[in-house]
Every structure is written in C-alpha cells, then in structure tokens.
Amino acid sequence: MSVPDIAGIAAIVVSHDSEETLDDCLQRLRNADGVAEIRVIDNDSSDASLEIVQRHAVADPRLRFIANPDNPGFAVACNQGAADSSVPWLAFVNPDCLVEVDTLARLREHAEQEAPALVGADLVDEDGVRDVAARRHDPDFAAMLRSPAAARLGVEIDTTASLQHVDAVSGALMLLPRWLFERVGGFDVGYRLHAEDLDLCRRVRDVGARVAVANEVRVVHVRGVSSRSRPVFVEWHKHRGLWRYFGKFEAPRRSGFVRAAVFAMIWVRFPFAALRALLRTQR
C-alpha cells in the first residue's frame, strides 16, 4: 500500500547477532503499511545478520543500513537510524519483533488521535504470554528499599480500553512523531543497554506528551535473541542503566543515606541476577 511521505514511517532496527529473527522482521517491515524508510543499524554482529540486511537492501531501495565497527549500544544506534531517515514518523522495532501488515499504521493512527503521543503495542511471546514490559510505571527506588514488590514495574492491561495510558512502554516497539523525538533529544546515549526506554518515555511525558499502549494491536516479541550469548554483559548494563536512571530522576530529591542504600541494592543484586541469567542460557 503506497503512503505519501507526509504520513511516512521510518522503521529503525538495531541488530546485534540477530540472524535468528532478523530476516522475518525485515520482510514483515517491507510488507507493512505506511513504511516509507527502513534503517538497520548493525552493532558489530558476528553472525549472518549483515548478510541478511544486505540481501534486503538490494531488493528494496527503502532499506539502508549502517554497519558499526563496534557496539556503541542501543541508544546510540537508534539515534543513528533516526538521523539517517527523514519522514515524519519514527518506529523503533527490535529485530525480534514480528509486526503484522497493519501494525505500524494502526499505531500511527492512535498516536495521531492522542497527539502528541508515543505509542507501544500489546507484546506477547510465541505462546501468547504478555510481556510485562509493554506496560510499566516509573521506577521508585526508595519504595523498593521498603518493599521488594515495588521492583515489579508491570501494569495490568485494561481490557476495557483500546488505548491505555501508562508511564512507559517497551523499547522493543515504540512509535512517535519525529518532532517529538527531536524535541526531547532522542535516546540518552549514556545508557548502553536497558532502561533507555524508561528514560525516553519519562522525558516525553515531561514535555506534556502522552505515553500509551494500543491494547488491540498485538505483536509477537521473541525475547532475548541478541542477548542469549552474553547474559552477564546484558545484566551488567541493565543494572548500570537502573543506576543512571535513578541518578537522573530520583537521586536529586533523596538523602545521601537513601542514595547509598539504592546503590547497594542495585549492585548487590547484580551477581545473583547475572548467575540466574547465565544458568537460563545453559538449560
């Protein structure tokens, strides 16, 4: 379906050792309504990811790619893809997200109706189990010190609402107007991996825009394709990202004691989380 550039969507995919799902992801994006540009930023893949991307680029002039010689992180690569595109809408799509033909166009419709807005989808795994990261509230680290239950950021789906307002959606799939992305300065490149989506959603809300999930737009998210080979690396940057998020948004209003306690809570948890992640990959 041909869509004029005034409504065009740039689909931005960051790949790293993503060959397992990348071919399917890109083919679906090429078939998707509203997609005017596809930008793939490859962060130093050692598998067949680049060969897959090159094959799609030859077949479809809408697709261009940047092959980074190292891995500067997800946020940096997303910003690279946004800067290399020009149409009014930006969709950040993980290589393990498998969109349907109408997915991005429907998200754009919701974002237009709620303007300005950043919109995510109802993410499920291959068995139909919902991803709790699709609907989240902001972390409250002081509350986590009082109760471990506060660490659970997931928000239940509101089955009565086609569009559910939340604090944050998953960076695995999010769509927003380019002008809004540029107004907040894009992704914070101080994050290497994880929590950059929480950060972006918070800054979007801080400028008066909305963050929401289109509950009736379901997308399969095959989680963890790129991270299975390096579980300890992923956990390290996940915890580092949480500490950065706390430092930006919560630490300035907390006492020195609370800041020290949060630091200890995050980094004491890291070795246990890393061990669990490592054991999961060996099953």
Predicted regions and their residues:
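Short, acidic, metal-binding catalytic loop of nucleotide-sugar glycosyltransferases
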Residues: 27-36
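A conserved acidic beta->alpha catalytic loop
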Residues: 42-51, 70
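Glycine-rich, basic loop-to-helix element that forms the pyrophosphate-binding segment
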Residues: 67-85
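Short aromatic/hydrophobic "clamp" motif used to bind/position activated sugar donors
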Residues: 90
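Active-site-adjacent helix/loop segment of glycosyltransferases
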Residues: 202-281
